[in-house]
Amino acid sequence: MKNTFARYSLTIPSIPENVISHLRQWNEWMVGDTSDDSPGPSSTVSTMTTTGTVDRRSLLSAASMVRQQSDTTGVRRLVRARAVQEDDEAGPHSSNNLAATMSPNLSRPTRYVKSVSQQRSESYIQLNQYRLMEEIGQGSYGIVKLAYNEEDKNLYALKVLDKMKLLKNFACFRQPPPRRNKENAAPSVLRNPLQLVQKEIAILKKLSHPNVVKLVEVLDDPNDNYLYMVFEFVEKGSILEIPTDKPLDEDTAWSYFRDTLCGLEYLHYQKIVHRDIKPSNLLLSDIGQVKIADFGVSCEFEGIDAFLSGTAGTPAFMAPEALTEGANHFYSGRAQDIWSLGITLYAFVIGTVPFVDNYIIALHKKIKNDPIVFPEAPILSEALQDIILGMLKKDPGHRLMLHEVKVHTWVTRDGTVPMSSEQENCHLVTVTEEEIENCVRVIPRLDTLILVKAMGHRKRFGNPFRNKLSAQSSIRDRRKSSSVKDPTYVPPPNSPPATSNNNLNSTKVDRPEIKCIEMNLSGLTLKVDEAMQSKVESARQ
């Protein structure tokens, strides 16, 4: 792929100098050696600043070649978003406007949209006001695409979920696990998977914390097989992709760890265990703030802790107690998150996880039995090693708890930088049954609305098409009878000859005698049969 991306001419109007410098560094990193005749990074960037048009097709084809590469700065995503802003009639982009574009306003409440319109072009898919662009990641049970909102000019991360898979496999949001004291509890009722989806969306809509990714909008349509969840876009992506030869230094890891600790405390305060804390699920904003993402295997609990059974999440980050099989085996959800947090901190500073194996059974055996070993390089402080070992105790009863991690000497730097209290960091979120029912609404189809309207006109819930059907049948009967009596009627060639009126009595079929009933209707006495009488009586009612 050497020198491939440099052959494309990217042109974006009025890009600030600081962004151009980032683009130049990124382009040099992507192109590498430019000793051949292809244009180098400098010529590419200068073309971008002097031309006022965008070759979108070239841009998209070029960016698709490198979509699998790591983009820690988010510049490539910004370039693609700029390429589709054809309707933006604002003035020249200043640095403040650029910051506003990359930092969406997340203070507004989560919206639920009940109709989705799609438009397809050669370069993108239009979904309501969102332009879907490249795939930027994959969650536990769905893909994530970069989306540009034409209304507020912001970038968002749009997660696409298959509703049929959700209903079939309990895919995205799982049923709460059984409790430890289930022999004394009432028999649990298996909830509809759609109800589990509704409850999880209702919870995510209310979560609001600087260190938790915000759910902005939910797009759903009964005529569409997909559910679209719009999250805030965190510009720099994942903190770290492991394994890596460039781990974080201890000071950077300290800052990121404290943010993650605040977000995890907020989730536990809301009675939610994440179950999949790892570096790739920790996203970094443009101001260096960590946000916890991907709640695909998260679980809500009641009481003081979640007693889980079974495995969920990433195997290398699972606690030893989660790997023990058995129908009556349960383990603490809070302790599982602390273990995953310890593995994450180890990966921050070492660049890999402590237990690695190509075979899952061998990996489980190492997690259960092998001790934590620190390599000779990089050299870690004693306080950092102590907190990692404390969070990675094999016995969950001896493992550090979250409030103990908050006051550890490495986290607080010997008490000079204390963490915020739980009261300052958290506020309780409650979700009522009514909110759960209303978070996912389904609009009826058009034919159902027409049927209900017809019933309203008749002022009763009968069959609004009964008279129409009877009228059509009577019209067919009249046409049939009139055609026989019509003198111009010509029967088919192979039809039997018609009988004369003189022979009608001889061929007449014996029919039962119809009993007539006299009815008084508006002063008139009529003779009708029983069927007609019932129709008249129903019409009177």
Curated annotation (Swiss-Prot):
Keywords on record: ATP-binding, Calmodulin-binding, Cytoplasm, Kinase, Magnesium, Metal-binding, Nucleotide-binding, Serine/threonine-protein kinase, Transferase
Any GO MF annotation of the entry: ATP binding
Entry protein name: Calcium/calmodulin-dependent protein kinase kinase
Principal place of residence: cytoplasm
Residues binding ATP, per UniProt: 136-144, 159
The organism's taxonomic lineage, starting at the top: Eukaryota, Metazoa, Ecdysozoa, Nematoda, Chromadorea
Region (RP domain), start-end ranges: 169-190
Organism: Caenorhabditis elegans
Annotated Protein kinase domain residues: 130-411
PANTHER family registered for this protein in UniProt: MAP/MICROTUBULE AFFINITY-REGULATING KINASE, SERINE THREONINE PROTEIN KINASE
Catalytic activity field: L-seryl-[protein] + ATP = O-phospho-L-seryl-[protein] + ADP + H(+); L-threonyl-[protein] + ATP = O-phospho-L-threonyl-[protein] + ADP + H(+)
